[in-house]
Amino acid sequence: MTKIFKIPPICLGNNNFIHVIEIQTIDQDFGNFINEKIRLITEGSTDTEIPKIKKRLCEFLQRKKGTTIEMGAVAEFMVHLYMNENGFKQEFVFFNLEERSIKKGFDGYYTINDEEWILESKSGTISTSGISHKSKLLEAYSDLEKKVKDSEGNNPWRNAYNHACHRPVESAEDIIKNLKTLAEDFDSGVYKKIENLNLLPATTIFLEGNWNNIDQIALLTDIKTALTTKKFKGINILCIHNKSLELLENFLTT
């Protein structure tokens, strides 16, 4: 299949990267890729018919029309597409297991090459005062710090464990066991330090129909500045320009 996300990652050193992702349209190849991955992303390994899954996702987006939940869901879905294309194993499903909503806790929990990665996705519109990939990166990092320190009153590892235990996710036993340990440690007040975690902060700016490319030189400078005081084991930063919030919903309804 044709590669959908073609811009090569920018190396930050020490096997850390910035991933520049530009979504200007959903053409036939991109649409085929969504159809190929939408079931895995939303439900895991099931036999649900693709049109039914598209309808379910579309109805969710329509219910949340005009809210930050809609924006966040579209941004996250595109992130999951990118991660799947680049070989990361999704250890969760997009939808909350208990209700018709997107999942809680971490925005994603991935594995690749025996390493585990936690995702935090932040998004906004180009018309928002002061918006930038740098500001959204700092916001995502701050939220990850809070989540792993119990600053929000929730156990994100418990949620990740519940998703990994969901049979259609097909998580390996060692992944499930590790998440169970992390969840129990968290409940006991033993928190994982952020410098020992692999982070996937994702920043999406919706361009409201007026396209412009990401300035990679300026982006690299901004990201390096933002990371000066940040701690992590490894980091992959996803910076996304999405032409329109409606691109995905329009595809789902055609």
Cite the ranges covered by each PLM segment.
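Interdomain/boundary linker segments immediately adjacent to catalytic/signaling cores
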Residues: M1-A73, F77
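A short mid-domain helix/strand-loop element embedded in enzyme catalytic domains
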Residues: E70-F77, Y82, G87, I112-N113
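A short acidic/basic microdomain associated with nuclease active sites
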Residues: H80, E85-K103
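A short, glycine/Asx- and small/polar-enriched loop/turn
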Residues: I102-G105, I112
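Active-site beta-strand-loop-beta-strand hairpin of nuclease catalytic cores
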Residues: Y110-I118
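Catalytic cores of nucleic-acid endonucleases
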Residues: S123-L207
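C-terminal structured domain segments
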Residues: N196-F232
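Charge-rich, low-complexity intrinsically disordered segments
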Residues: A218-T254
